[in-house]
Amino acid sequence: MRSISRTTFARAYLAITFFSVSAGIAAEPVALRVESFTVLPSTGPLAFVEVENRQPDPYRGMIALKPPEGWRIVPAEREVVLAEKETKRISFAIELGRNAALNSYAVEVTATAGDTKVVRQQNVACASAPYFKPTIDGNPDEWKDAIGVRFTEGGKRTELRTYWNRRSFSLLVAVEEDTLIGQRRSGAFDGVQLAISPADSRTATSPDKVADRYEFLLAWTGQGTAGKCFRLAAPETQLATTQNNRDLSSLQYDDATVAVTRTDGVTYYECSIPFKPMRDRIRPSEGREFFLSVLVHDPDGTGIRDWGKTAGLWPWQRNRLAWSKWPGAKWGKQPPYDNKLHWGLCASKY
């Protein structure tokens, strides 16, 4: 489906926006974030709001979620009680929802405590993988029935599409960029870095702890459609180890299948990763939730594009230990965001 870059992919993405009656997010008593939906809104899923107490005192307030026009969510509001620095997930049931062609849903969440009100506006996506086994050959035609998740960084668009079956998890990343730099022995090169984690995992903040993720790097070899996959981390990998620039040849993961193509200024990374090594922690089944995040490396263009930023993670959720270093990466001044973004496995997008 070469039209991904011409039609749906080429449409403008509505950026996440913020609004608050307070002076700024650092001064607000609570921080708010609406998580991505993990199944399509038309199927009546739960919508989750993360609320973090940012003050040194307990917080008690009411949380209200305003959905897109024409939707119905219950209850209208929920009470939340938070201890100092505590974070909770508040759920709302979508009784009536409609799927959007662009997979972008404008929502507004409000926290009210007495005369103090905090409001955040977001555009959230449905982040879910339908059941299907694509052929990994560099041709994106089979991905039209996947759910596209789109974001823009530095004026360049990125689109993520995912599938799953009992044996593998598949990913297509369409990257709008000026040039594609293949893997080389020295100097920076392009790539896609992804982290997959169980839904109950948390990223540690100390290098003496161990990883709780399966982390991979996809890169073009520089020849034809050939791509490579490197496994940068697995559960129990020492986080201190992930912060070293290790020789990629020792990390090559031949159990994954990768193809890389480029058409009309868009690079397509297509990959299939076996579930077998992950099955004990992430069992493939309809309705399963897990964490998935992606970094796009475009060293001669936009730099790093971080799905965590677009998904609305808070500024203090940047975590250098959430992502492995590797030779050829060109990191920015700030560390990337955490890799714990909700994703789901569903039956179909229809």
PLM regions: where:
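Bacterial N-terminal signal peptides
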Residues: R11-S22
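Beta-strand-connecting loops/turns
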Residues: S42, K85, L102-N103
